[in-house]
Amino acid sequence: MAIKSVGSFILTALISTPLCSFAAQYPLTVTDLDGRAITLQHEPQRIILQDGRDIMAMALLDRDNPFRRVVAWNNLARKQDINTWKMLQEKWPQSAQILDMGFSDKGNVDLESVISRQPDLMIAQLRAKPALEESGVISKLSALNIPVLFVDYEINPGKDTAPSIDLLGKVLNREENAKAYTDYYRQQLDAIRQKTANITPKANVFVEALAGNSDACCFTHGHNGWGGLVEAVGANNIGSQLLPGASGFVSLEKVISMKPDAYIMTGSKRGNSQVLPLGLQADPQEVNRQAERLLSRTGVSNIPTIEAKRAYGIYHHFYNHPWNIVGMAYLAKDIYPQTFSDLNPDDSWHYIVRHFTTLPDLPFVFSWQQGE
């Protein structure tokens, strides 16, 4: 769905700092995505990012430099999304000097090194809360009066992503920047949902998350992550019907028996991995070669959906990403191609980059379609 460009004077206004009418007053008490009341005594200036993908949220808010306030983070891009890290490092070279604490969902971290950076806020993903509690990270930070603010793009992505960005905008005194993005986000999601609301029967979709990352097929998500995104665009996620938890493996025989209407593989460029190397500055020929190899795996080629050429690939990190509206656009087009024949998800990414950030608008390959 192409979006007409606006005048340069509007673009300048969009990427400028917030107007005083949105200025936050501190001390400030907010309710995070875990339903907890969090009080901040002053505007946070030294932030920990438990999940490094939140740097893309910071890019929407601190547009001149999303690393300006970050003193420690889990640099997932360096490990799992090589070209995104290259882009960030080239644009903001100081990012390479920020402590990479390797903060895992299991709560493993050298907390003393993190605390030595004198943080005044930790932004964390809600899915990590149990591990952070069990490891004592939350209690230790609380004892030092360092607030932990939970956001969510994965447990319930269609519902929680926009409120998470609004929350961060309020906490970081960037409400106008946040609102500009979330207004766009909600408009795009509403447009998708209006088109799929009356579709019956709903398409049945299987998402093989990180296809090729394991010798076994088929790893997938339940109601969260990719499952939540599939459901948000008006389709049935097969993993939600079969898994007791957030993610897990479904046997190939079971996938075949479920007769999905669309088979979607996700991936990103991550070293020598065998997954789809989708992402910024990806090589379309490399993506196509890897996709064809994945579809030729023993048994996978026998899935009726693949025989019918209804297999697709999508950039993996949309499953837990503040820009997941782009991922939902790709899903909508892949799952309901006739309904969304005029939708161009690439345009959504370009629009976000150009209107809500100062990131370079690099070429990318975020999707793949069988037979093209």
Language model feature labels by segment:
Residues 22-372:
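N-terminal ligand-binding lobe of clamshell/alpha-beta domains
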Residues 8-18:
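Bacterial N-terminal signal peptides
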